């Protein structure tokens, strides 16, 4: 009887260890907002039509092509990470869709030699095979807004998450961020009939990472490690430098999308999505100093953005609604419809934060 009692006590203790272990409870959004640094409010001037996948976490990351001749005819490429890529006009209307399966993040570069002629290269992180990351390449036709698939390039062992493009003297590189924090710089050659890639540098962050952006002027790579914060890798380096911690103040985890506004030779701003409190954190360049935060809130006819994954930012004239630049944020909660992307005038953000 004592043996049975002892065994029962041991069993009960084991069950308690499993069942009574501390449970990490999510902090309510109102508390996260209250604990974080203040954020100024701006409203969106436009939004895209929802992606095609309903009632799911589907929209993820946008990229921008600016039409210098006719800025109002610029285009947006956005991922539906369960289906493929959409192309939108600045009016938010869908112009094209290409079935590419599970593509997560996207970026693009103009004036890239594609099959012997200059064109707009679109690159997405392809996670259709979770064990083997790939880069999916496309050509964007600015006249028709149509995407043409060019093929895929190996991106390393692991699941593809983030991607961003950079250009230097060697050419155009895709920086593919794997789920485990590994980052490969892959030099792309799309000039021939079949695109090829060569891994020229590998970096590593400790945990799950995704959003990234490259400053082509300096070669610096900025990467968001979701639970940790924003890092910088200098050109050619494999050693990360912390820019901003996900401390619940400046950045509330997850740190997600990263975008850059380049001004002059080295100036401008880096923006990171502070997903945990529906805000965006801004650091100045070149000193990488924290300068403030903003939030996209509900306007008269267009909703705000919440739980943002990917963001994009480009300066320049985008027509009367966006004369100084365009900021785009994925909206994780778009009413009763599928997720979409919100369009914000950079001038409104500059005014709200009192930036130069």
Q: Language-model segments: what does each one mean?
A:
Residues 13-14:
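Residue-level signal for mature regions of secreted extracellular proteins and peptides
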Residues 20-356:
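Sequence/structural signature of beta-propeller domains
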Residues 1-10:
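Bacterial N-terminal signal peptides that target proteins for export
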């Amino acid at each position: 009887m004592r043996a049975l009692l002892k065994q029962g006590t041991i069993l009960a203790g084991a069950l308690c260890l499993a069942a009574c272990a501390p449970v990490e409870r999510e902090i309510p959004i109102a508390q996260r907002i209250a604990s974080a640094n203040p954020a100024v409010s701006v409203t969106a001037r436009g939004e895209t039509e929802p992606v095609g996948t309903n009632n799911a976490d589907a929209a993820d990351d946008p990229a921008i092509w600016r039409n210098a001749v006719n800025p109002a005819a610029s285009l947006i490429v956005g991922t539906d990470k369960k289906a493929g890529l959409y192309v939108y006009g600045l009016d938010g209307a869908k112009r094209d869709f290409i079935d590419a399966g599970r593509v997560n993040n996207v970026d693009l570069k103009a004036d890239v030699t594609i099959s012997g002629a200059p064109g707009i290269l679109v690159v997405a992180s392809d996670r259709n095979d979770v064990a083997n990351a790939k880069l999916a390449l496309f050509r964007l036709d600015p006249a028709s807004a149509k995407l043409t698939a060019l093929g895929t390039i190996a991106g390393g062992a692991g699941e593809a998450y983030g991607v961003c493009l950079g250009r230097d003297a060697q050419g155009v590189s895709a920086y593919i961020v794997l789920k485990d924090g590994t980052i490969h710089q892959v030099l792309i050659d799309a000039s021939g009939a079949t695109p090829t890639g060569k891994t020229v540098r590998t970096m590593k962050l400790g945990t799950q990472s995704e959003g990234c952006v490259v400053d082509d002027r300096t070669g610096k790579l900025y990467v968001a490690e979701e639970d940790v914060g924003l890092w910088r890798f200098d050109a050619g380096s494999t050693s990360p430098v912390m820019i901003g911690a996900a401390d619940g103040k400046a950045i509330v985890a997850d740190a997600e999308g990263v975008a850059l506004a380049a001004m002059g030779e080295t100036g401008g701003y880096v923006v990171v999505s502070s997903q945990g409190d529906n805000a965006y954190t801004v650091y100045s360049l070149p000193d990488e100093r924290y300068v403030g935060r903003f939030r996209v809130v509900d306007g008269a006819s267009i909703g705000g953005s919440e739980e943002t994954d990917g963001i994009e930012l480009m300066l320049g004239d985008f027509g009367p609604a966006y004369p100084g630049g365009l900021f785009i944020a994925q909206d994780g909660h778009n009413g009763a419809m599928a997720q979409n992307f919100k369009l914000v005038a950079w001038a409104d953000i500059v005014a709200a934060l009192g930036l130069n």
